[in-house]
Amino acid sequence: MPIGFNKACLKNVFTVILVLIYLALTAVAVFLAYQTISDFMDKLNHPVMSVSYKEVEEFAAPGIVLFPGKAHLLSCMHHYHDNIPPLVALENLAKRECMKEEVIYHGPYSNQTEKRALVFRGPTDVRNRELIFLQLSRNETEEDFSAISYMIFAKFSDMLESSDKAAFMMDCERNYSMWTFSGGFRTWVKMSLVRTSGRRNESVEFRQESSVVKYIDKRPPLEQTNELFFIVFQWRDPFIQQVKDIVTANPWNTIAILCGVFMALFKAADFAKLSIKWMIRIRKRHIRAKMREMNQIS
């Protein structure tokens, strides 16, 4: 009997150890399931940014908006292959080579401020390095700094097709950045287009590189009181930068891992249940054997 008792005791101890091992494995499986779900939700809520470049033959004509204030337009011309002819006398300047619209509207942040905007049709032929060259003149200013503000929006045709151009310009001023260029210099702006696609909307942004060259004024001293402004707009390269949010979370991979974890949990639970039943059966058998031994002694 002591030998049988020792065997039963060893079996019980071994079974308890197995149950503890499977409980530990169950805890690991639960932690793995929690970690898998947490990683999936984190990747779902924090998509990664993908950047690609699309090559185009030509761009849609952007809208170039100047806010001249008291300045007036002298000339607007299109040139190609980075070639700008030498400046000519003011009376010989060509004014009507560019397509433009004049819009009067109130600023989006203050209804008291009335703005005058000159909207030009921007260059399109990036392969032939098309550019637009603007010259302006201003003879007086009440501001502390001599500069003219400008902005660029996506499509000039959108403004032409708009039934309310004033409201359109207000929306552009809210959504697009504003830049400036100074008098007495030729500012050369090279534009690039960036399209950003989010979950709910798509935005268009213009990035620019600018270089500034001082204008050598050869006019008579009396005419130099009229300050001249020069600005060039050109596409930098034939590529559109496309920025997209990509969700790297793979639901099928997550589901497969969770299925494996739950199968392991069910197997562990089933084994634990059978082990406990077997321990109870062994315990009852041991008690019955002990009772028979006591009855024989009595």
Curated annotation (Swiss-Prot):
Domain of life: Eukaryota
Main localization category: membrane
Membrane topology value: Multi-pass membrane protein
Topology Cytoplasmic: residue spans: 1-12, 267-298
Entry GO terms, CC: chloride channel complex; plasma membrane
GO biological process: chloride transport
Alphabetized GO MF terms: pH-gated chloride channel activity
A Pfam family of this chain: TMEM206
Transmembrane segments: 13-33, 246-266
Subcellular location: Cell membrane
Residues in the Extracellular compartment per record: 34-245
Catalytic reactions of this protein: chloride(in) = chloride(out)
Keyword Transmembrane on entry: yes
Keyword set, alphabetical order: Cell membrane, Chloride, Chloride channel, Ion channel, Ion transport, Membrane, Transmembrane, Transmembrane helix, Transport
Similarity comment text for this entry: Belongs to the proton-activated chloride channel family.
General function of this protein: Chloride channel gated by pH that facilitates the entry of chloride ions into cells upon exposure to extracellular acidic pH. Displays channel activity with distinct kinetic properties compared to the human ortholog channel.
Protein name: Proton-activated chloride channel
Organism (species): Danio rerio
Organism taxonomic ancestry: Eukaryota, Metazoa, Chordata, Craniata, Vertebrata
